[in-house]
């Protein structure tokens, strides 16, 4: 029975992990940080964003780091997913503790956008790097392989045409995101009803919010929406979606649903990020679309969908994006994007894990 230490701090990473586990033998035992009652910590305890938030939780993060390094002694291998600020130092400490411990990094940090030096650190401390973007491999010397994209394993619904019956609203998975995005989405929904007539309004809620008091999280205006915990099905049925920046924007693009990306950070966090990251786009679909068109990812001229960021984000901007988007062009180009990513990644990652464990 192989024991795997997992560090999956993000909601999206846990969705990818669940799909991966379907491709692994049932006797694999998982320990660490992931969505499970048996885990050391729940990913919800790491649900922070912004530089000030990190400083405020530093004591907890250091404690969790120390416990994960100790827990690694029980593991046959280590699987790190995304969350590079936590996981790269973790890989370094585990490798120092046991140089023979096999470490896989799946869902690589965006070294093509900033902190390119992280690529060298990953190759130094990890044994296999699973790239989910075709262009990522070029930033590494030898240990990275393109394994496919996990969303192509997970998405079961793909549009065959641009039609849809609902408007979908996805204000994020963090409380701070919801507090900023949801009031804007509510106002946009109300004005759209005045202008366009009534359309079903669907609020997609993260699955790990099940059982929580949604009114306390979203406020009284949640009563204006139908609630869905199934993002893929809801996007498939939608005419248009308003989405907080994140993995959901790429999900919408692959499904074929027209959408506008919305994002607003704390002013200080945004200014710091702007100094560190030089990108025209923050949406994954736009970044991939640049690469597809042989442009520098995130810095190209081509755009698949509108992005409303920081002071450009307003109710008026959301309405304009809805009204002016060329839906037919978008749908055609979204099919090209799906072809670019080729296939899913879970089976390849499962094979590489077996290889690292000397089970093949």
From Swiss-Prot:
Domain of life: Bacteria
GO molecular function: lipid-A-disaccharide synthase activity; phospholipid binding
GO biological process entries: lipid A biosynthetic process
Reaction catalyzed: a lipid X + a UDP-2-N,3-O-bis[(3R)-3-hydroxyacyl]-alpha-D-glucosamine = a lipid A disaccharide + UDP + H(+)
Keywords in alphabetical order: Glycosyltransferase, Lipid A biosynthesis, Lipid biosynthesis, Lipid metabolism, Transferase
Coiled-coil region list: none
InterPro entries xref list: Glyco_trans_19
GO CC, alphabetical: membrane
Reported function: Condensation of UDP-2,3-diacylglucosamine and 2,3-diacylglucosamine-1-phosphate to form lipid A disaccharide, a precursor of lipid A, a phosphorylated glycolipid that anchors the lipopolysaccharide to the outer membrane of the cell.
Family from the record: Belongs to the LpxB family.
Name of the protein: Lipid-A-disaccharide synthase
Natural source organism: Helicobacter pylori (strain J99 / ATCC 700824)
């Amino acid at each position: 029975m192989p024991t795997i230490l997992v560090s999956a701090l993000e909601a999206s990473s846990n969705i990818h992990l669940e799909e991966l586990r379907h491709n692994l033998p049932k006797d694999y035992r998982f320990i660490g940080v992931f969505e499970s009652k048996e885990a050391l910590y729940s990913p919800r305890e790491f649900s922070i964003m912004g530089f000030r938030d990190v400083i405020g939780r530093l004591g907890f993060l250091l404690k969790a780091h120390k416990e994960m390094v100790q827990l690694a002694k029980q593991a046959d291998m280590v699987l790190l997913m995304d969350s590079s600020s936590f996981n790269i130092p973790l890989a370094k400490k585990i490798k120092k503790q046991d140089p023979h411990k096999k470490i896989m990094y799946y869902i690589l940090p965006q070294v093509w956008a900033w902190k390119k030096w992280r690529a060298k650190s990953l190759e130094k401390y990890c044994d296999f790097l699973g790239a989910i973007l075709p262009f990522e491999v070029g930033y590494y010397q030898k240990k990275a392989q393109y394994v496919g994209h996990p969303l192509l394993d997970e998405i079961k619904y793909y549009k065959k045409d641009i039609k849809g019956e609902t408007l979908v609203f996805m204000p994020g998975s963090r409380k701070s995101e919801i507090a900023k995005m949801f009031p804007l989405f509510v106002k946009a929904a109300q004005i759209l009803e005045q202008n366009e007539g009534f359309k079903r309004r669907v609020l997609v809620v993260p699955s790990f919010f099940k059982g929580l008091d949604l009114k306390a999280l979203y406020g009284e205006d949640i009563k204006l929406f139908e609630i869905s915990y199934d993002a893929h099905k809801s996007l498939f049925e939608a005419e248009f979606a308003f989405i907080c920046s994140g993995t959901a924007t790429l999900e919408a693009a692959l499904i074929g649903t027209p959408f506008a990306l919305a994002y607003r950070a704390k002013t200080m966090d945004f200014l710091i990020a702007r100094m560190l990251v030089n990108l025209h786009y923050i949406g994954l679909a736009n970044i991939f679309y640049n690469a597809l068109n042989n442009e520098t990812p995130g810095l190209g001229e081509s755009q698949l969908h509108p992005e409303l960021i920081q002071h450009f984000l307003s109710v008026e901007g959301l309405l304009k994006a809805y009204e002016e988007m060329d839906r037919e062009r978008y749908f055609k180009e979204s099919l090209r994007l799906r072809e670019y990513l080729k296939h899913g990644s879970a089976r390849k990652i499962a094979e590489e894990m077996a290889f690292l464990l000397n089970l093949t």
